[in-house]
Amino acid sequence: MMKRLVVLRRREPAVRFSCCGVRYGECRRNHAASTGGHAVDGCREFIAAEDGGGGNSTSAVGVAAAALKCAACGCHRSFHRRVQVYEVAWDDDCASGDTSSSSPSSSSSLSSE
């Protein structure tokens, strides 16, 4: 005789992560690589350099090159640690006003975590 197996599903609140933007942190350029050592300059955050306004820097290529150079340490943006900033969005069925269900699985879905 076969036994019955009952599987109960809980409705977990859906969580959506969306990438809001990218921030560049501290500089990781090794200035002592040629001597076999390790020395960083201490730049804590990437700050885009503004163009000086002289000569050929007003072209689109000059502005783009200036935006990739750090104003604080002079390094390229690729030497700075890339940090992605995420936004968390929760989808709650209970918050939408759907309280007509009296099943224990739907009422305990928020308190399980």
Swiss-Prot record:
Region ranges (Disordered): 93-113
The protein's name in its UniProt record: Mini zinc finger protein 2
Molecular function in Gene Ontology: DNA-binding transcription factor activity; transcription cis-regulatory region binding; zinc ion binding
PROSITE patterns tied to this protein: ZF_HD_DIMER (PS51523)
GO biological process, one term: regulation of DNA-templated transcription
Species: Oryza sativa subsp. japonica (Rice)
One of the Pfam families matching this protein, by short name: ZF-HD_dimer
Keywords from the UniProt entry: Cytoplasm, Metal-binding, Zinc, Zinc-finger
Localization per record: Cytoplasm
Chain's role: Inhibits zinc finger homeodomain (ZHD) transcription factors, by interacting with them to prevent both their nuclear localization and their DNA-binding properties.
Signal peptide: none
Organism domain of life: Eukaryota
GO cellular component: cytoplasm; nucleus
Subunit structure, interactors included: Homo- and heterodimers.
Family matches, as InterPro entries: ZF_HD_homeobox_Cys/His_dimer (IPR006456)
Residue spans of biased composition, Low complexity class: 100-113
Originating gene: MIF3
Zinc finger extent (ZF-HD dimerization-type): 24-83
